[in-house]
Amino acid sequence: MKIFLKKVFKRNIIKNMSYVAGASFVAQSINIIILPLLSRIYSPSDFGILSVYTSVVGILTMFTGLRYYLAIPLPKQEKYARALLYVTSVAHCVFVFMLFVFAYFVGDYILDKIRLSSLQPYLYLIPFGVFVTGAYTIATQWAVREGFFSTIGWTRILQAICGNGAKLALGIVGCKPMGLLLGAVVAQGCGSSGIFRASIKKKSLKFTLSRTDIKRSVIKYRNFPIYDMWTAVINVVGQNMPQLFLSFYYSLNAVGFYTMAASLLSLPISIVGAAVGQVFVQRGAQAKYDGTLASFSEKAYRIMLTLSMYPIIALSLLAPILFSFFLGTQWEKSGLYAIVLSPKVAYSMTYSPLCMLYAIGGRIKQSFYHEILLTLVMLCGLYLGSSWNNPTFSVLVYSLFSLVIMIWRIAYILSDIGIERYKVLRITFSVFMEAACLLFLPSIMLLFYHKSLYTVLVWIVSGIIFVCYNYYKFCKRHIL
């Protein structure tokens, strides 16, 4: 054990992870601190335009570089990694050039046909945003290859400072909503420039290439553009579907309210979810070879679901009050979106790490098909909800439909490793009912006596009961 720990510290693995994780936390903290100022400078419709813009850029970015950048850290020989960097950079520049050409000739026509006319004044920012976002993604993969983990960490902090600084400065001088869009572009540009400076300083970008190395690299990692790219596109389309759908059928205000609720409610997932997912993959792979994957996954599912369901739903019930105080009175309606989204978001905190079982169990093809199914069901939910001509109700139906499919996917993958589906559904139902029972009285008090001291006491008691009961339950079952 001592030898192992020495090797770990010698390789600086823990040090590198702490750089990235710590920087991500600092960057998120900066975003949260600045958000109350931005929410008072910009309107919900301004944030709606930003959301639609970032959705379009995010989807297009999945095509850039043909996804070869994901293979940069993989080759053992440096010459093949450099060949991949060259290929993905050239493909990225060609794709962005094509976007500029399309924007010039048919950009306005396409945006009008897909009901995104709100982006027409900012048409040329779309390919520019794809350029800086793709450049940062490629630069980050090269930095991982070169071990520039401290640089990656600092660029995330720099992105938060420069991006939010640009949004504040441009908003104060009345550049709305352009300030939000330019701030997003500035953030990505600052990140990639920092990594490129570190690479130039180390002289790791000075190299020669051969056609043979390029050809071998392209052929060996051809699955990235053939399969991985389309999986990523489907995933990103599913993630951004509500924003685009709300902009199609309702208003930019609805998009802004939804985006604010979803982003704030998903903060625990963005901060904790990625770290939990990485740990789960490492421990799950080990458990697979030990023959304990089923018991480990069941315990992980029970713990993560319990620790996410009650806190996130409780936070969502308080969202109308918290958003009005934290963001300003114009954002109170965003709290309603948080309430209807809460079951889906709470389950997503468990769902995201558990989906790593597809990779651990070698079920990549099933994951692809299930991702398509989830996207189609989410689209159906939004479309059916639109029949009532109410954006909040549309989001509610979307949330419930998504929740059902996510539960089905987890039941499927857990049953595939030896856990009965009935048992998975029983655990899920019991955790949902536990949260509902603990939050029933606090919700009633909040609805009718939200200014009473007794309401505060009821919420505190509910939280104490949740902590004590689950600590006792987990200790009794030897889960902790």
Predicted regions and their residues:
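Membrane-interface junctions at transmembrane-helix termini in multi-pass inner-membrane proteins
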Residues: I14, A71-Y80, V132-L158, V173, ...
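Hydrophobic transmembrane helix module of multi-pass membrane transport proteins
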Residues: T61, V90-V233, N240
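Transmembrane helical elements of multi-pass membrane transporters/channels
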Residues: N16-N31, Q159, G163, L180-S199, ...
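Alpha-helical transmembrane segments of multi-pass membrane transport and lipid-handling proteins
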Residues: F25, S29, L70, S89-R115, ...
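Interhelical loop/hinge segments that connect adjacent transmembrane helices in multipass membrane
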Residues: M1-F9, I195-Q239, V279-S295, S415-F429
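Helix-loop junctions and terminal segments of transmembrane helices
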Residues: M62-Y80, V144-R145, A261, L265-Y301, ...
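Transmembrane alpha-helical segments of multi-pass transport proteins
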Residues: F102, L373-V377, V397, V424-L480
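Hydrophobic alpha-helical transmembrane segments
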Residues: S51, Q120-P127, G153-K203, A262, ...
